[in-house]
Amino acid sequence: MTWSATLALAGADGEPVDLWRTLMSHGVADLPPNRIDEEARTLETTVAVPRGRPQTVIVREERDGKAALSGTAGKRSEAVLDGMRHILRLDEDLSEFYALAADDPDLQWVTQGAGRLMRSQTVYEDVVKTICTTNTAWSGTVRMVSAIVEHLGEPAAGAPADSPFGRAFPSPAAMAAAPESFYRDVARSGYRGAYLRSLAQSVASEEIDLEELATADPDDLSDDEVAACLLALPGVGPYAAAHIMMLIGRYSRLVLDSWTRPTYASLNGRKAKDTAIERRFRRYGRYSGLAFWLFLTRDWVAEPV
């Protein structure tokens, strides 16, 4: 049994959403259980469903400002639709950011629907994936995440054998139950294995609640406090913390690393100190990091002629 549904491509305040720019917003978005087809311009992902079996969903953009969703098995459910709204950040209001960008000649283009960084169903998943990006080539990241999803993720109906696709990202309990040998010999995650297992155990036992970091009001939990919480996690350093903060909607910090610095220098025509880069985007306030990221990644999507 298959099903179909549509979602309006609009933010919380009715602002436009560019689906393709959302799907292409950062590299981690293409890690299993996600699969982006650049030729067909679609996203395939498998979402966990409370008290039910995971469902694999294919998302594509329609011409009338909607996203078309099709389920490969099972029945349509609000839980799946809510999961996709969350992943695509359709519940986020970027109107304040767009008002700032409209006055910046370098970033006026984002007001047409850019700026939604595709996220995972859970903060936990984004933290695990980010840890897997540290101190390794991209091929190593893909290998680690693929093994974790393939061997520990719950399959949707019809999931192919020996594949990370068609499976939901594993729960903290599933990752905590995996032996050290899995992380060493199967995922081949090196020193990260101990970090991933420790993190999974802490989340599964409810010693740590990562999800509250994404839902807490900034007035109650400041960006500095969120950063401190993330830096206290095993395997999370300054780069990983800044990346995770972007994915949970805390955009005040710029991700300054070995890719962003030279990319900014190339686009800007000259090298710049970190303080100068931060000063350039300071006018965006709590959106400074998002503005910086979009400045760097505009050419990731070809613009209409």
Sequence positions of predicted segments:
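HhH-family (HhH-GPD) DNA N-glycosylase catalytic core used in base-excision repair
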Residues: 1-305
